């Protein structure tokens, strides 16, 4: 996967978290931290005035709305989701580490194969092309050695090559 795909996925993940936070932790669903005050008047999206959610000390169960902060965090961070998010984050970090290590290894191999004096930089041949060329060269060298060994064995065993000159002047070799 390319870097743009990762950036897009990360952007969507952040956007989803922000939207989730806006839905489940909007001012009408949570109670501020004790001691913190909301502005005097709070409005929702339609322009309606919302209740004051400040905690009232000494009024257990009566008078005002119950604190909803615990319920909001319970919806937003259930233990199973936290565990799943932790597993995903760990696996994602491991994947990113492997990808960066692979990219670093490829850059080191390119420097070593290309050499520091080549000066081609990014315009150098890809490593796969060099690898294929190396395989072809090795195969061709092996073939030439095998043919030389056959020729030598034929000469040693007495089956010398017979060459005939045909009418057109071509030489034909026989084993």
From Swiss-Prot:
Pfam families: Hormone_2. The gene is ADCYAP1. InterPro entries: Glucagon_GIP_secretin_VIP (IPR000532), VIP/GHRH-like (IPR046963). It comes from Gallus gallus (Chicken). PACAP is a neuropeptide involved in diverse array of physiological processes through activating the PACAP subfamily of class B1 G protein-coupled receptors: VIP receptor 1 (VIPR1), VIP receptor 2 (VIPR2), and PACAP type I receptor (ADCYAP1R1). Exerts neuroprotective and general cytoprotective effects due to anti-apoptotic, anti-inflammatory, and antioxidant actions. Promotes neuron projection development through the RAPGEF2/Rap1/B-Raf/ERK pathway. In chromaffin cells, induces long-lasting increase of intracellular calcium concentrations and neuroendocrine secretion. GO terms for cellular component: cell body; cell body fiber; extracellular region; neuron projection; perikaryon. Belongs to the glucagon family. One of its GO terms (molecular function) is type 2 vasoactive intestinal polypeptide receptor binding. This is Glucagon family neuropeptides.
């Amino acid at each position: 996967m390319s870097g743009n795909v990762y950036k897009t996925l990360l952007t969507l993940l952040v956007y989803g978290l922000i939207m989730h936070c806006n839905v489940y932790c909007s001012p009408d669903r949570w109670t501020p931290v004790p001691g913190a005050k909301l502005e005097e008047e709070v409005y929702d999206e339609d322009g309606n005035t919302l209740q004051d959610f400040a905690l009232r000390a000494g009024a257990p169960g009566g008078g005002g709305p119950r604190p909803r902060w615990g319920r909001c965090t319970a919806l937003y961070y259930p233990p199973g989701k936290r565990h799943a998010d932790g597993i995903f984050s760990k696996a994602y970090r491991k994947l990113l580490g492997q990808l960066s290590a692979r990219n670093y290894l490829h850059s080191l191999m390119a420097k070593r194969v290309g050499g520091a004096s080549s000066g081609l930089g990014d315009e150098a041949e890809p490593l796969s092309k060099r690898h294929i060329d190396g395989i072809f060269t090795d195969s061709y060298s092996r073939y030439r050695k095998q043919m030389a060994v056959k020729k030598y064995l034929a000469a040693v065993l007495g089956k010398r090559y017979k060459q005939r000159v045909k009418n057109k002047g071509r030489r034909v070799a026989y084993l």
